[in-house]
Amino acid sequence: MAAFATAEACDSNAELISNGDLRALHPIFKIYGQRRCFSGPIVTLKVFEDNVLVRNQLETKGEGGVLVIDGGGSMRCALVGGNLGQLAQNNGWSGIVVNGCVRDVDEINDCDVGVRALGSNPLKSTKKGHGEKNVPVHIGGTLIRDGEWLYADSDGILISKTELSV
């Protein structure tokens, strides 16, 4: 991906911001992974302290997409760890945004993928397979729909109804 500046995107797309087609997530996410800047079409998951669907999704070809995981904001366990970070890298995912925690931070930071999460927790999640895929999720003060576009850099995270020109 070419360098994409979220601040510039906001400055040059005032109309999209005013009509709600371009939205910024609240600045609550910590930055992990080697990609500080990433973007792609969104695939959504809604899970709670269970990462079976996360693994299942990351086992598919990412084709430059971004997996957005609504983990309910739980800080009690991690939904993504080093193995899943490596899986995301190997399968061509551009990034992962977790409304929840990660673990194996050093391993994730070695992966060529962008990861944003609320924090880290060494506890693993349950493995029951509960959750939903391709559903609207509400994260960081923003409604996010499957198929929208996500743009992330060191300044923040934007959600766009359509792909923006870089």
Swiss-Prot record:
The lineage of its organism: Eukaryota, Viridiplantae, Streptophyta, Embryophyta, Tracheophyta. Homotrimer. Coiled coil: none annotated. The modification N-acetylalanine is found at A2. One of its GO terms (molecular function) is ribonuclease inhibitor activity. Pfam families: RraA-like. GO terms for biological process: regulation of RNA metabolic process. Keywords: Acetylation, Lyase, Metal-binding. It comes from Arabidopsis thaliana. Divalent metal cation. GO terms for cellular component: plastid. It catalyses: 4-hydroxy-4-methyl-2-oxoglutarate = 2 pyruvate; oxaloacetate + H(+) = pyruvate + CO2. PANTHER family: 4-HYDROXY-4-METHYL-2-OXOGLUTARATE ALDOLASE 3-RELATED. This is Putative 4-hydroxy-4-methyl-2-oxoglutarate aldolase 3. InterPro entries: RraA, RraA/RraA-like, RraA/RraA-like_sf. Substrate binds at G81, G82, N83, L84, R103. Belongs to the class II aldolase/RraA-like family. Its EC number is 4.1.3.17, 4.1.1.112. A divalent metal cation binds at D104. It comes from the Eukaryota.
